[in-house]
């Protein structure tokens, strides 16, 4: 099969260049890219006026299968990814059973082969994500796990986390840390501050995140292993990561779109789709996160896509589960809130959604080099539409961005040379 993407502006994160090129794909691989490539017999995709970038990678999603298929399945979650412009997703292990052994990792891999995009499983750090004993890391790596995390739960035992970093380091893998001190966050439902006091809701202090970020940076520094800080939300965390990088600590970090767009004031209407963990923080925290994105302290933009059923979220704020969906709004939020606002250049934004997550996970993606898998996202910077959850491919509708006009949207998603989404419609 041959496909020619013609007339687009190629954003190349490896070369660090943006230039008009045609991209020629043969049998699922990138054959070549250059000016005015003419190839007889190829299907032509006109990308004039659009950005052609390596397939976007979301390294933090919750696909909910096995065990929570009412919220999402690998089938629906990968379709949501395709509609959102993502060609690869890495799914967290907080399923039922927990993905803490090779058998569950193999099941997710097998189901992922039938999905619309590439699926990379992340294995649990501890058995059952209970934080008591290490899971079988070697078996999970052999089965296809690309990283280890107890996301949704912190590893409270510092000695256990130290051993996890040591073992992961020996395997050449990264540990993704959900930084939350449960002794500080216990019972909290939103950011601790003026708004939580006004609403009468128990708060989660910034220190609940920051003390664990500091701990895991120290453990990574001592062991020489790699740690990736998930969903950074506070100014203090950004500062700690920036200082650690300056010392040469092998730490990387990600931020979710809701943490660079929304503050705790979004909770004023008691909309349970604003209930996330870590919580929406103060305006100062949002500004610090944006600064961390701009100066390279934060390496990756990842959604923390966390679908829930309408019934689960349609309860009092205190009782609702944490989480919001993000796969189908991420690109629009990045382009509207960061690129159009001048926080990031288009190239910087693409690097944080392609090359950097690929490098953190150690997967052969995020490039448009000849011979690479033909995973490509085409973004139309002029395309705009309001967020309409009724059009989501995800089972989850729990978004606080309902009705928000976003400009700069994925126009086509190509996985292995096959167009899986075009004109906002999944094929």
Swiss-Prot record:
Species per Swiss-Prot/TrEMBL record: Pelotomaculum thermopropionicum (strain DSM 13744 / JCM 10971 / SI)
Domain of life: Bacteria
A GO cellular-component term linked to this record: cytoplasm
Cysteine disulfide partners in this protein: none
Keyword Nucleotide-binding: no
Annotated family: Belongs to the metallo-dependent hydrolases superfamily. DHOase family. Class I DHOase subfamily.
This protein's name: Dihydroorotase
Cofactor binding note from Swiss-Prot or TrEMBL: Binds 2 Zn(2+) ions per subunit.
């Amino acid at each position: 099969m041959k496909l020619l993407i013609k007339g687009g502006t190629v954003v190349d994160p490896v070369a660090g260049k943006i230039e008009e090129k045609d991209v020629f794909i043969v049998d699922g691989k990138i054959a070549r890219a250059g000016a005015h490539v003419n190839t007889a017999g190829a299907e032509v995709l006109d990308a004039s006026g659009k950005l052609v970038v390596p397939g976007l990678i979301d390294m933090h999603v919750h696909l909910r299968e096995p065990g929570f298929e009412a919220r999402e399945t690998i089938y629906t979650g990968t379709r949501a990814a395709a509609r959102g412009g993502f060609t690869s997703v890495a799914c967290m292990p907080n399923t039922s059973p927990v993905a803490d052994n090779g058998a569950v990792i193999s099941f997710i891999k097998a189901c992922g082969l039938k999905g619309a995009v590439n699926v990379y499983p992340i294995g649990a750090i501890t058995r059952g994500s209970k934080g008591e004993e290490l899971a079988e890391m070697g078996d999970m790596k052999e089965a296809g796990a690309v990283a280890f995390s107890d996301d949704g739960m912190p590893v409270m035992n510092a000695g256990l986390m130290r051993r996890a970093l040591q073992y992961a380091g020996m395997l050449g893998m990264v540990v993704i840390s959900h930084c939350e001190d449960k002794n500080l966050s216990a019972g909290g439902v939103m950011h601790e501050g003026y708004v939580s006091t006004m609403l009468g809701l128990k708060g989660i202090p910034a220190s609940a995140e920051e003390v664990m970020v500091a701990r895991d940076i120290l453990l990574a520094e001592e062991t020489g292993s790699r740690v990736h800080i998930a969903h950074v939300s506070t100014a203090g965390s950004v500062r700690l990561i920036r200082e650690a990088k300056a010392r040469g600590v092998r730490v990387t970090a990600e931020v979710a779109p809701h943490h660079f767009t929304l503050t705790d004031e979004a909770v004023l209407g008691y909309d349970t789709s604003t209930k996330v963990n870590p919580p929406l923080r103060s305006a100062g925290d949002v500004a610090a996160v944006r600064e961390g994105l701009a100066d390279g302290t934060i390496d990756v933009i990842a959604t923390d896509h966390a679908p829930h059923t309408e019934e689960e979220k349609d309860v009092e704020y205190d009782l609702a589960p944490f989480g919001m969906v993000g796969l189908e709004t991420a690109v629009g939020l990045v382009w509207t809130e960061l690129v159009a606002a001048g926080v990031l250049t288009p190239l910087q934004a693409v690097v944080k959604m392609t090359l950097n997550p690929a490098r953190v996970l150690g997967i052969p993606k995020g490039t448009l080099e000849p011979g690479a898998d033909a995973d490509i996202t085409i973004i139309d910077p002029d395309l705009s539409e309001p967020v309409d959850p009724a059009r989501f491919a995800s089972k989850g509708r729990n978004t606080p961005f309902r009705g928000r006009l976003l400009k700069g949207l994925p126009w086509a998603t190509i996985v292995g040379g096959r167009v899986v989404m075009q004109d906002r419609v999944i094929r």
